[in-house]
Each structure stands twice: as structure tokens, then as C-alpha cells.
Amino acid sequence: QGECAVASVYHLPIMDGSIDFLLNCFSPLAIDEFRRVLKQGGHFAYVVPAAEHLWQMKEVLYDEPYPNEVKRTPYEGFRYVDVLEVRDTITLDNPEDIFALFQMTPYSWKTPAEGVARLKSLTTLTTDIAFHIHLFEKE
């Protein structure tokens, strides 16, 4: 049986050493807090964008699109278990969905106005989605 909680990643409302598995998806990594709440031998999955995530959207937004940084970082007190790459292609077929996806990304904070205007002019967008799921075990 599982339970879910939505909270600040830096102040989880969870007792020390009480969690078997923790999922962190596109959120800041609060490694000290994860170390605190995970049981010995517990795992956490860290989901981050792969290099080409939303590449075709970035081609619309930027004159020179850039790949996302990909790294495998060791964390003290955790053993790196594995990484899984998940890829697919999605098609958004209306401007509202395209802009909603854009607003869920950090690109919405740093894209030049010209790029936003190009994106808003689209009626359809087909783009790659690509994630890395890193798995760690608390030592």
C-alpha cells in the first residue's frame, strides 16, 4: 500500500527514516531531506529531462537551441543504481495546449519575446519528449 504527499521538497512532512521509495520528478533535488526521510536501503528515483527533451519546441523558441545538460552525479550516502531513458514523440493540436506545455517549463522564464510570439502562432506542435530516470539507494 502506498501513500502520497505533496509538499515542499525541502521540508517534507514525513518522519525520519520512514520511506521505502521517493519519486522526485522535475523538481529541485533536496538530497539532505531525501537522506533524512528514506529508510536504510530505501530508494529514490530522480526524473530529469534528457538532452533532447522538447527539442522541436526549443527550435521554435530559440535561434540557437541548446541541449539540456546531462550528468550522472554521485550523492554522499547514496549508491547510484541505474538510469533508464524514456523517449516518445507527442503532438499537441491546439495553441492552448502548446502554450500550457511551454508554461510548465523553465523556458517560459527566459525565452525572448520573439520566440514566445513564434510559439503562440503555432496551431500544432510535434516534439520529442525524453527523460532520464536515475535510481539511487540509501547506503
List the predicted regions and their residue ranges.
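Conserved beta-strand segments of alpha/beta enzyme cores
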Residues: 3, 79-82
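Conserved beta-strand signature within the Rossmann-like core of class I S-adenosyl-L-methionine
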Residues: 41-53
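A short acidic, Gly/Pro-enriched loop at the edge of an enzyme's catalytic core
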Residues: 10-22
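Conserved Class I S-adenosyl-L-methionine
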Residues: 51, 58-80, 86-139
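Conserved SAM-binding strand-loop segment of SAM-dependent methyltransferases
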Residues: 1-13
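Short, charged, surface-exposed secondary-structure boundary motifs
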Residues: 14-17, 54-60
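A short, conserved alpha-helix within the catalytic core of class I
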Residues: 26-40
